[in-house]
Each structure stands twice: as C-alpha cells, then as structure tokens.
Amino acid sequence: MLDFVNDYSEGAHEKILQRLLETNMEKLSGYGTDQYCESAKQKIREVCECPEADIYFLVGGTQTNATVIDALLEQYEGVVSADTGHISTHEAGAIEASAHKVLAIPHKNGKVTAKAVKQYFADFYADGNHEHMVFPGMVYISHPTEYGTLYSKKELEELSIVCHEYDAPLYLDGARLGYGLVSEENDVTLADIASLCDAFYIGGTKVGALCGEAVVFPKNNAPKHFMTTVKQHGALIAKGRVLGVQFDTLFTDNLYFEISKNAIKTADTLKQALKEKGYTFYIDSPTNQIFLVLEDERLKELEQKVAVSFWEKADDNHTIIRLATSWATKEEEIKALIEIL
C-alpha cells in the first residue's frame, strides 16, 4: 500500500535523529533556555535578516496558532481568515476555545486578497453598531495555503499595507513554509516575510522534524509575557532541547531548504505524469499538494492500493482527493503511483 495522505507520516530526517542521539546525555536547562535553542534562534535570525527577532519554539501547529492568536488579540477581538483557512476548518475550534472568533471571509484559490480584507474592515467600522460586534483584530494567512497555493510578494505587500492601516497584525502560518519557499513559482523570501508580517512561524512538523514550530516576532515585538501564554496553552515542553536541537540542525547548511526541494521535485514529476494521462486537477497547486477530481468508482479502485486524503465531494459522482509529497518521498514511490494511476 502506497501512502500519499499527508506530509508528516514519516518520523524525522536522519541528521536530526543523529543530533538528538549525539546530544542525548547532555544535562541542559529546560523550557527553551538551552544552548541549542539559542543557536537555532540565531541561525533563524540570520536567514530572516531580522537580528532583533523574538523567537520561540512550540510543540505543534494548532497549539502555535491558538497561542499566537490569543496573545495578539484583545478579549473582544477576532481573527480574519479565509473560510478555507486551517484555523477555520481543521483546528477543532481551538481559536474559539480561547474566546476569540474566527471571522471567515471568502477565499480565492485558498488566499485572501487585500481588497477583500480592506472591505471587511471598512464595512465593520461603517456599521453604527460595530461596538456590539466582534472586532477584527488581526489577519491570518498561510503560505502555502490549504490548497497549496502561494502568495506573491506583491500580494503580501498589499495585505501588509491594509493591516497597518487598521492597526491589525498580519500573521502567517508557515506549517509548510519550506515547501512554499523552494517552489519555482515563489518570489517571497524569509526576509520578505519577516519584513511584511508582524508574526509568523516556520513549520518543522511537516518539513523534516519530529515535531515543533518556530514562532518569529521579527521586530522585537513579542506580546508581553508571551512565554506565560505559551505555557497556558500547553505548547511549552520542559525538554525544550528537543525542539532546539531539531531547528538548529534544520538551519545548518541549508538543510531545511534542501530537504524541502524533494517534496517539490517529486510532486512536479507526479503532476506532469497526471497531465499526460489526462487527469482533471481541482486547482493548480505549485507546491507539494496535488488535488484531483476522480469518479467515485475509480477512487474505490485506487484506494485498494493507495492511501489518499479525501478533500470534498465535487458532485454526486465525483470526489476531490489530495495527494501529498514530502521531504521523505522516494522516487520509487512516485513511479509506483504513476503505474497504478
């Protein structure tokens, strides 16, 4: 059985496992205060070109989003997101559980536009009863999006301008950031993201790490007592070294970017073969997620040999599925899948 369900099925890159083993018996301070966390932070500051950045290592994506959003918002505020955004669809109401509403707006290929965001803010403040409503306090985006699509630098610049106009932080979810950054269609760098966003995170869980995400407040702008908020959300681990060693390794010799390239390379190979075979794509994704529209009978046959991710029903007789490659996908797996398809 081949498995293309997601990009976090494997454990971790061998270099990470090697470093975890090499440092295993060292006695280190806890909660992210060890030398490896500090080394990783410095390397991230360098690649992001933001020497004053505040950086924190959290355990996973949902915890990270819930923690950052809760820390950035006032009690009466919510977060603007695409209706397809991860916080709106696949985080079990984690944002709402911290008493903040997700203010969903229509997406365009998984993205929100500066025009739509500006219109939302303008409509809100034009309403004479807006004091009785949930205030839009920040904007959430992801790069890549849930559809594997990417924001251009121009789009980020436009969003940043709107957010500054309304004094609303722009927060970027980077769960799959490595895959986005190495895509041929990407024109955004980590330095660009650090310049245009008020907060973002660099995903490790889906890009070669066992677990962990690196939260970056690029302008020395972490919310007051942010570590306490991290603790309250259960996103702080005592053995912070586990995350520090992993990110220190990922940002040594460009490992994070090099292993990300494998996901794009294998996805591109698969997409080309699918195009040649005449398959119907639901959306054109330039990263590691491929969305196909299949007849239900064909899907039943495929699922006997390949594990895929259900996305949504296209109509009564067709289903949209997702195939995901990763840093660990082997060429042999792609060849085998192409033969089956």
Each language-model region and where it sits:
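Conserved C-terminal alpha-helix-loop-beta "cap" of PLP-dependent enzymes
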Residues: 74-76, 268-341
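Catalytic PLP-binding core of fold-type I/II PLP enzymes
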Residues: 151-183
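PLP-dependent aminotransferase-class I/II
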Residues: 99-144, 151-158
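Conserved N-terminal alpha-helix of the aminotransferase class I/II PLP-enzyme fold
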Residues: 13-61, 83-84, 88, 94
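Active-site C-terminal subdomain of aminotransferase-like
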Residues: 108, 135-136, 142, 150, ...
